[in-house]
Amino acid sequence: MAKKSTIITNWPKYLLQWGVLVALIVFITGLIPSEVAVDPEAYCPMGGLQALATYLANNSLPCSMSSLQVMMGIALVAAVVLFSKLFCAFICPLGTVHDLISKARNAMHIKSLNIRNGSVADKVLRIVKYALLFWIFYSTVNASELFCKNLDPYYAIATGFKGDITLWMSIVSICIVVLGSFLVDMFWCRYLCPLGAISNTFKFWLWIGVLFGVYYLADVLGANIPWAVLLGAFCLVGYLLEIFHAKPKLQVLKVQKNMAACNNCGLCMKKCPYHIDIKSCQGAVDSVDCTLCGECVASCSTGALQVGVTAKAKGKLWNILPAVLTVVLIAFGMWAGGKFELPTIDMKWGMEVMGPDSTMVKVVDMDDLETVTIEGLRSV
């Protein structure tokens, strides 16, 4: 059966994906003049999660991070725990570029290389993103500086290769994104994206909750286990769960399959960006790769697939719910991020004296000031 386009039937996905990509291009290139310099990291959840880890480990934040990015990272995790990988489906610019390149390849009638889900090659390649996750977070927390900027293809392009990058790392990353997505569907997302590793791991949030609980209990009991051990355990547990138990069942929303309406045509699997074997699913589609992007639902000619809490969910409104939830969670992250600031400096200078209005004020004697050298800060 020929594959039909889902751009119209799955319009919420494309509206958000292309809208975000166009907005980034417009603001970063300066097509809309602004008195304030555009920060390509302003709403980055990956940077926010690295900042949160640094804050918890060192009580400091990377110099370019704030509570806004931290809240965006928390919003991403909340979306994964409750629903699915909504950021991956609707917002991520790298995922959108991946999708566009795949569509261009299909338009040229070039077949992609097939790395079957669950194959030996698939399982081996999936470990790479967890290795990158450990490397990036370990380096970031140790230096209190976002290490991912050295190799992030989005950051390199968004800054015109003028940001705090390592040129050869950035070029290699960009080549991998372009060539990988042209040769293998969702190559970056499946095998290399560290944020994808975080998202996949938090799909098994009960296991991760137990892991964090054990670490906290050990700390209370005085074990003083280094934070890097927790990071390593997080990556290892996430990888093992992904390859040996790739069917998380703890999310509220899922793609539900009506077995009676399904004609086993297999079109849903072909349209799925990750080629999840939906045809073999019984009832709910439980897959660690599922992002609730809606491609399978939009391509089904018999109406056998539906987004919902249970198989009894009916109506088209359910199918646009993931996109709506994405917007709501992002709006919440932006709102919450503007409501507070994480305190990272608690040192005070000067001598407190009684002011004219009977309030205590800080007085600094300029003669007593000394030069303070702060290591580890880098300009952007």
Regions found by a protein language model. Give the residues of each.
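Non-ligating segments of multi-cofactor redox enzymes
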Residues: 1-271, 275-282, 288, 297-298, ...
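Conserved, short, structured surface segments that act as functional micro-motifs
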Residues: 291
